[in-house]
Amino acid sequence: MAGDDGVQSEIGKDGVLAHLLSPDSTRSRDEPEIATNIGVQLQHMGLKTWSISILRRLRDALGRLQPQSILEVGAGIGHRSAWIYDMFAIDGKHPAQYQLVEDGAKFAVILRRLMLRHDAESYTKIVVGNLDVLVGESNAWFAASSTGVEIGSPPLERNHDAIIVDGTSEQRARHVESLLPFLSTGGVLFTVEPDMPLGDIDESDTE
């Protein structure tokens, strides 16, 4: 992973995570224009996305990591992807591979438009389907290939330097576990904390 060795040698392994998630003062704090427009669409569609502050931290971390392979799960209509594509454009470089996974075919059409707008066909792969099924099919493919039998390619590649996981709180927990084997050595998986439970808290509850 480009940039990773330099980061670790400068600050030591214990400080890598804190360094990755710290704000990068050299980057704009404004939301990219395309991401802003997609954010308006999200509101009209009643969909949720990560907060601007989290998206900034993700972008800053990816900028430091300079991953050569990224897997984004739960890409939606591309709000987070627009931030990432904008970073590629500003930096003047992109990874060798950027896989976007989305369960809905209609959303995949929107993702394709975003990909074309950024001239990212050469390194972007949009995968449509249920992640649990895709992981199972990919694991089966890798098991078969280890015996010398290879037909086509797996739905999901392995050895990603960065994996981004979105979805409901329950989905995220399950998907994080199933996707850890798809990380490269030294790779980083990004997600958000579990959703806070709603409702009243019993006054006798001491937890």
Q: Where would I find each of the regions flagged by the language model?
A:
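A short acidic, Gly/Pro-enriched loop at the edge of an enzyme's catalytic core
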Residues: 139-163
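Short, flexible loop segments at the rims of nucleotide/cofactor-binding pockets, characterized by
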Residues: 47-50, 163-169
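C-terminal substrate-binding/active-site "lid" region of AdoMet-derived donor-dependent transferases
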Residues: 152-156, 162, 169-207
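Rossmann-like AdoMet
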Residues: 1-69, 96
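SAM cofactor-binding core of SAM-dependent methyltransferases
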Residues: 47-137
